[in-house]
Amino acid sequence: MNLNKDIATPARTNAILKKHGFTLKKSLGQNFLIDLNILAKIVEASGFDEQDGIVEIGPGIGALTEQLAKKADKVVAFEIDGRLIPVLEDTLSAYPNVKIIHSDVLKADLPGVLDAEFSKGQAIHVVANLPYYVTTPILMKLLEDRLPFKSITVMIQAEVAERIAAKPGSKEYGALSIAAQYYAEAKPMVVVPASVFVPQPRVDSSVLKLTIREKPLVEVIDERWFFNVFHASFANRRKTILNNLVHNLAGKDAKAAIEQALSEAGIDPKRRGETLSPQEFARLSDALYSTLRKAD
């Protein structure tokens, strides 16, 4: 493959940036990896096979892309910063199995790209070092659009990874935990110190693996309503589940109907949202869906 030295070293990274006169944009959360051991752990954590396809988001100068291209059948990478396209074309020129797309992945036609770039029936995984500022929107788009990914392995802010994988009753548990775990099994894999990036971010990162479920974690009457219910339940963590639902879901006039739904779901109205499991939220969502519709 590539006869050049690996991209993810301090010397090579600096040489690439200097060669192309590239300056980092803070607004795009650009932090480049300079540790090959961490890259190896990301690739290992993702668990893809050599015949699989990879979607990468935010390839930067190609450090992770290069390692993915060595082991996967094909890598399709979305880069929002047009200044990086010629850099990537240079650093990844030895890898014919890499396709760079200049696009914001949040606005891209992902189904169309997957159909065009990968073989029918080919297993596809997402592997990415995501910018902190756009982590949640990207992850939720990938999950909510129900694209045919087997897994999503991402390096993200450690605190966000903990929130996504959190269990009921923990201080990290919240709406993001339920939203992500509804679609996927979440497992933190590797803690990554800030020192392996150029420039160094202010916080540590974590590699998180989301293994997509064949069917959602819980079954509900109305999925959008379910999401509305648990989001409302976490609006104010100091309030009880009853107060949060009254103030953030249906209004004071619906208090009696909400109390009835809580009773039907077997949930104490004095509990707080962070103590409810996804299964309890599913029961509550269905009960609220029925009682509030009757009250209308």
Curated annotation (Swiss-Prot):
PROSITE patterns recorded: RRNA_A_DIMETH (PS01131), SAM_RNA_A_N6_MT (PS51689)
MF terms (GO), sorted A to Z: 16S rRNA (adenine(1518)-N(6)/adenine(1519)-N(6))-dimethyltransferase activity; RNA binding
InterPro entries with a match to the protein in the record: KsgA/Erm (IPR001737), rRNA_Ade_diMease-like_C (IPR023165), rRNA_Ade_Mease_Trfase_CS (IPR020596), rRNA_Ade_methylase_Trfase_N (IPR020598), rRNA_adenine_dimethylase (IPR011530), SAM-dependent_MTases_sf (IPR029063)
Enzyme class: transferase
GO cellular component: cytosol
Keywords for the protein's UniProt record, in alphabetical order: Cytoplasm, Methyltransferase, RNA-binding, rRNA processing, S-adenosyl-L-methionine, Transferase
Compartments it resides in: Cytoplasm
EC number: 2.1.1.182
CDD domains, A to Z: AdoMet_MTases
Catalytic activity line of the entry: adenosine(1518)/adenosine(1519) in 16S rRNA + 4 S-adenosyl-L-methionine = N(6)-dimethyladenosine(1518)/N(6)-dimethyladenosine(1519) in 16S rRNA + 4 S-adenosyl-L-homocysteine + 4 H(+)
Binding site for S-adenosyl-L-methionine: 31, 33, 58, 79, 104, 129
Physiological role: Specifically dimethylates two adjacent adenosines (A1518 and A1519) in the loop of a conserved hairpin near the 3'-end of 16S rRNA in the 30S particle. May play a critical role in biogenesis of 30S subunits.
Family as reported in the entry's similarity comment: Belongs to the class I-like SAM-binding methyltransferase superfamily. rRNA adenine N(6)-methyltransferase family. RsmA subfamily.
Protein name: Ribosomal RNA small subunit methyltransferase A
